[in-house]
Amino acid sequence: ERIYPAAGGGHQIVTVPCSGVRKGAERTVAVADGVVYYLGNDGVYAFDGSMPVCVSRALGDKRYTGGVAGGESGRYWLSAVDAAGETELLVYDTQKRLWHRQDNTAAVAFARWNGEMTVLCSDGRLLDTSGTLGTAETGFSWSAESGDLGLYTPEHKYLSRLELRLKAAAGSTVKAYVCYDGDNVWEQVGGVSGEAGQT
């Protein structure tokens, strides 16, 4: 509800229907960069004081039923639980407006400690999200996936060429796969091994 004060005393209260916090997801409410983020019935919402806006369309059709979240400068951390009880650790970059699926870490709580975001896991581990505490991890496999490219432009154009620019660490391997027309069959179309100073 919004209250519109008037000098003459005829204040108005206007009810605006919008998506609120999902029942049972109250622990997903967190503030990052002055914006309130939370899990609603059909996705993660950002509320900056005007109207809530769904910011999780890029995560696809998967629906989450609850979880725990924490906010820090530039990031909204969400340990989300789906209907099957599976957990995913999701991170929303508030500056670039990008989602990152980290892993299946089941968080119990998020807290800021000495200026760093820490995660208390259900197995008792305490993780540091900045990488300044503890020991550095070794190399690991990861992936990045775009949405459909070119299909939703006014001209419905298909891409004839796609260029990726990246800087791979020395000794690393990058492989590129494509999926045509949503058939869910991924084909490797290229790859490169990282060398020092190469982009």
Report residues per predicted region:
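Surface-exposed extracellular loop regions of Gram-negative outer-membrane beta-barrel proteins
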Residues: 1-17
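Beta-sheet repeat architectures centered on beta-propellers
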Residues: 21-35, 41-199
